[in-house]
């Protein structure tokens, strides 16, 4: 399937905004390492599960927790430290733009549906276990399969560009207050 043209409405339209509170969990370990596009994975709840698979955009905000660090094992066997966002800086705690993939990620042949949030910000540390509040303000495109990793990265970068242009509009800026 070819990438469809993206038409972003002047303001969020029903069913948006969708506001969610969640927690960042470890994912598959490929967003940063393989693609250079880190993601904050979140559990799929009933609201997210009802959305059409694809790419969405909106705003998000991280909040650290005071829980002690803990070590957890990813599905690939690698261990990760859940620091619950304790190392986040003030700049990391601002409301930030995001794109989110919900689906099966056909390029990677996932066996379970995933929600992966790419926060458009440079972080110095991981923040597994941190709280995340976000809103979904619109839909960019359906999930697609790719023949190369480079084509996937190119499309993700286009999604980011589209999201940033949409979120720069006054009507979307009003939803920045989470």
UniProtKB/Swiss-Prot annotation:
It is an enzyme of class 2 (transferase). It catalyses: riboflavin + ATP = FMN + ADP + H(+). Keywords: ATP-binding, Flavoprotein, FMN, Kinase, Magnesium, Metal-binding, Nucleotide-binding, Transferase, Zinc. Belongs to the flavokinase family. This is Riboflavin kinase. Mg(2+) binds at residues 39, 41. Catalyzes the phosphorylation of riboflavin (vitamin B2) to form flavin mononucleotide (FMN) coenzyme. Its EC number is 2.7.1.26. Pathway: Cofactor biosynthesis; FMN biosynthesis; FMN from riboflavin (ATP route): step 1/1. Zinc or magnesium. Coiled coil: none annotated. GO terms for biological process: FMN biosynthetic process; riboflavin biosynthetic process. It comes from Scheffersomyces stipitis (strain ATCC 58785 / CBS 6054 / NBRC 10063 / NRRL Y-11545). Pfam families: Flavokinase. The active site is at residue 116. The keyword 4Fe-4S does not apply. InterPro entries: Riboflavin_kinase (IPR023468), Riboflavin_kinase_bac/euk (IPR015865), Riboflavin_kinase_dom_sf (IPR023465). GO terms for cellular component: mitochondrion. The keyword Thylakoid does not apply. It comes from the Eukaryota. GO terms for molecular function: ATP binding; metal ion binding; riboflavin kinase activity. PANTHER family: RIBOFLAVIN KINASE, RIBOFLAVIN KINASE/FMN ADENYLYLTRANSFERASE. Its cofactor is Zn(2+); Mg(2+).
């Amino acid at each position: 399937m070819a990438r469809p043209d993206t038409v972003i409405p002047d303001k969020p339209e029903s069913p948006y905004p969708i506001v969610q509170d969640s927690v960042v969990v470890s994912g598959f370990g490929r967003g940063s390492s393989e693609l250079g596009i880190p993601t904050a994975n979140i559990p799929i709840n009933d609201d997210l599960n009802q959305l059409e698979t694809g790419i969405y955009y909106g705003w998000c905000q991280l909040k650290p927790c005071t829980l002690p660090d803990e070590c957890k094992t990813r599905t690939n066997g690698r261990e990760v430290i859940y620091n619950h966002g304790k190392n986040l800086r003030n700049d990391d705690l601002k409301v930030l733009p995001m794109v989110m993939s919900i689906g099966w990620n056909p390029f990677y042949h996932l066996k379970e549906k995933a929600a992966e949030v790419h926060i458009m910000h440079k972080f110095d540390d991981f923040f597994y276990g941190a709280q995340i509040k976000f809103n979904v303000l619109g839909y960019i495109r359906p999930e697609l399969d790719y023949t190369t990793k480079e084509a996937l990265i190119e499309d993700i970068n286009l999604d980011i560009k589209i999201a940033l242009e949409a979120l720069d509009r006054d009507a979307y800026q009003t939803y920045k207050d989470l």
